[in-house]
UniProtKB/Swiss-Prot annotation:
One of its GO terms (molecular function) is zinc ion binding. It is an enzyme of class 1 (oxidoreductase). SMART domains: PKS_ER. It comes from Cronobacter sakazakii (strain ATCC BAA-894). The lineage of its organism: Bacteria, Pseudomonadati, Pseudomonadota, Gammaproteobacteria, Enterobacterales. Zn(2+) 2 binds at residues 93, 96, 99, 107. NAD(+) binds at residues 175, 195, 200, 262-264, 286-287. It is found in: Cytoplasm. This is L-threonine 3-dehydrogenase. Binds 2 Zn(2+) ions per subunit. Its cofactor is Zn(2+).
Amino acid sequence: MKALSKLKPAEGIWMTDVPEPEVGHNDLLIKIRKTAICGTDVHIYNWDEWSQKTIPVPMVVGHEYVGEVVGIGQEVKGFKIGDRVSGEGHITCGHCRNCRGGRTHLCRNTVGVGVNRPGCFAEYLVIPAFNAFKIPDNISDDLASIFDPFGNAVHTALSFDLVGEDVLVSGAGPIGIMAAAVAKHVGARNVVITDVNEYRLSLARKMGVTRAVNVANESLQDVMNELGMTEGFDVGLEMSGAPPAFRTMLDTMNHGGRIAMLGIPPSDMSIDWNKVIFKGLFIKGIYGREMFETWYKMAALIQSGLDLSPIITHRFTIDDFQKGFDAMRSGQSGKVILSWD
C-alpha cells in the first residue's frame, strides 16, 4: 500500500510502498479517507532535535485522520464494516494505576500513532478498537480528520469554567485558534488571542475572537483597557511554548487566575515565580485528550453550531503531499487536509 514514511534521519518525508498492516484480535482495520498534517509531522519532516530523539526510522507517520472500518478483529464488539471513524492517537497500556483508575490520558506508557508505531499517512491503518471513535453522520470528513488537534484545543479550553470569564490565548496556531473559538462558543466574555503571525491572527478573527492582537506592534494592556478590563484575565490558555508570551500571560492574569498549558516551552524557561505565588495562580499541564470525554465534547460542540471550517485553509490529494507540507512549513496556513480517495 502507499504510505508516507520517514525513511532516513534527514529532512523530508517520502512516499513509499509498505505491506498492509495485520489486524489483531482487538483491532480495527481502517481504510483512510482523509488525513491532516500536524505540527508534530512538520517536526518529523524537519528532523529537529525532538524527532531525532523520538522517531525510529523507517516509520509511517501521521495521526490525524478519518476513515472507514474495513476489517474487525474477532474479539471486537460495537463496530461494523462501513463505520466511519477517527481515533485516539495515544495507545495506552491498560495496566498502570492511571489506566486502571480511568485516567487513561495520563498513562505513563503511552505509545503514539505515527510516532512510536505506524501512523495514518497510509491507505490503511490498524488501531485497537478501544481507540476508535465513531463519527456522527452530520459531521463532515474534513472536520473529522482534524478531531485529534481539535481535541487538544477542547481539552485545554475546557479545563476550567469559562462562562462569563475573560480569556487570554497565547499562540494563534490552529490549536490555539480552535481553543479560542471553543471559549467563545461556550460563553466566555472576552476572548483575546496573541501572536506575531498576521496570517494566523486573521484566521482567528474569522473564527470570532473578541480581539486578535499582534504583540509585535500592539500593546496587550492597551487592548485590555479598550475592552474595559480592570482586573486582568481570569483564564489563560498557553498554546505557543514561547517564553515571552507566557511571561506576558503571567503579567496580565488576575489574582486567582487559572492557566492551562499545552504549548511546550524550552526546558530552561525562566519566569518570575513571585507572580505565580502572590497572585495565587493555578497552572495545569495539558497533554492529549481525555479518553474519551474530550471526544464526546468535540462532537457535541460541532453539532451545537461551532463552526471550525475557516481553520481548514488548504486541501491536496495525497500525491501532492509535498505541497501540503510546504504550506504547513510556510506558517501561512491553517489546517492542511490530504485526501486519499
